[in-house]
């Protein structure tokens, strides 16, 4: 079973929470962050390059030092304050009428090492290294990771009872997403939550934050090696996560746009597709794929339905049966010559939150030649793949809404 604990969050007073809270560091580029960040915004801590001229490189030592300086300053000014008691917290997010309720807690780095925290994506060492530097220099998890767990009726009841109270925070963000936050500070409920996770929940599933999770585990191992009196209970062994029951989560589509047809004409490309797909022209109106193995394609001002032909993919392989794998193998690799989704500059990825209109816009602008929309992966598929130790192809899952940063921070002290 997993190991969790409460923690004393460092967080903003309720009257300035909207001024401090910000989108995650990887949602905005530096220019967007400069434009959005107010005086108290956490972006000065998560994207400290915005406090310098744009020509300074994001990973310059001055940038990292500025992050530390700002974190200390925010606490000194009272814009971030540490709770006096270790608590659990409930964080609710509402998007388009659907609400998901997460428990904010600390997970143990050992569970990542032993596979109880299950991943579905590979990480890149350079991104891990960057996140590791941030955790190390701040001695804190500034932003949480996003976990799922299999539903537990008693935990669901505790959360349901908690959210009948007036929330500590309650606001709408710039995307019209709702955010609410409650503190669980009574000892009986805290003990009950700890016992339920440690006794009944056998795994966490990383939904979003693979690099932050890996970085937290590496920092924990580093601090462990430097402590001759290490016990495993020190705060550095734990990192901050928001954990949602899997039934409440919805994965959005994660789509692809490609710059060229690898030397083919549109007619030759369509002919090549027909070897592995039933291709049907759908006209100028946006076409959404509505079931597994059905794809939407936008080319030369027209939408097409692509239906993968039986026998052209391995329906016995949990990875081979994924639509991202089918598209990668039969189209992106075999026809368009894109071998590595992580490094090929001819392909880009568009999260489903932007809508399929973003795909046609990028093609019509001339920036891209063709776009593909996929039917979303299900939480069951994600969990089944993680449970079998398999890894999904890059850019398979898009979770929305993203966790808001600045509502809670975990100190490793």
Model-identified regions with their sequence ranges:
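Surface-exposed, charge/polar-rich loops and edge strands
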Residues: 1-413
């Amino acid at each position: 079973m997993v190991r969790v604990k409460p923690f004393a969050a460092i967080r903003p007073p309720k009257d300035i929470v909207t001024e401090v809270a910000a989108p995650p560091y990887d949602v905005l580029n530096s220019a967007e962050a400069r434009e959005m960040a107010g005086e108290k915004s956490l972006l000065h801590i998560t994207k400290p390059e915005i406090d310098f001229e744009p020509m300074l490189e994001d990973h310059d030592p001055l940038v990292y030092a500025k992050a530390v300086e700002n974190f200390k300053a925010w606490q000194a000014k009272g814009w971030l304050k540490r709770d006096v008691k270790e608590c659990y917290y409930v964080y609710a997010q509402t998007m388009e009428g659907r609400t998901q309720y997460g428990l904010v807690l600390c997970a143990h780095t050992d569970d990542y090492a032993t596979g109880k925290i299950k991943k579905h994506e590979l990480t890149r060492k350079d991104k891990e290294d960057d996140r590791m530097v941030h955790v190390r220099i701040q001695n804190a998890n500034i932003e949480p990771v996003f976990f799922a767990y299999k539903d537990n009726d008693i935990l669901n009841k505790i959360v349901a009872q908690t959210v009948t109270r007036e929330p500590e925070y309650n606001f709408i963000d710039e995307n019209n997403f709702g955010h609410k936050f409650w503190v669980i500070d009574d000892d009986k409920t805290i003990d009950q939550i700890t016992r339920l996770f440690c006794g009944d929940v056998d795994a966490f599933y990383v939904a979003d934050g693979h690099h932050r999770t890996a970085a937290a585990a590496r920092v924990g191992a580093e601090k462990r090696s430097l402590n001759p009196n290490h016990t495993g209970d020190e705060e550095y062994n734990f990192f901050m996560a928001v954990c949602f029951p899997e039934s409440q989560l919805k994965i959005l589509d994660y789509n692809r746009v490609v710059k060229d047809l690898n030397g083919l004409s549109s007619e030759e490309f369509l002919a090549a597709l027909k070897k592995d797909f039933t291709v049907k022209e759908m006209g100028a109106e946006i076409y959404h794929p509505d079931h597994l193995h059905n794809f939407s394609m936008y080319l030369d001002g027209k939408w097409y339905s692509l239906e993968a032909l039986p026998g052209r993919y391995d329906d016995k392989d949990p990875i081979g049966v994924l639509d991202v794998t089918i598209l990668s193998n039969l189209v992106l690799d075999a026809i368009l010559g894109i071998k590595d989704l992580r490094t090929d500059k001819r392909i880009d990825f568009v999260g489903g939150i932007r809508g399929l209109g973003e795909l046609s816009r990028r093609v019509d602008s001339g920036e891209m030649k063709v776009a593909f929309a996929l039917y979303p992966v299900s939480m069951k598929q994600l969990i089944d793949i993680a449970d079998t130790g398999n890894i999904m192809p890059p850019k398979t899952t898009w979770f929305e809404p993203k966790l808001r940063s600045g509502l809670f921070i975990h100190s490793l002290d």
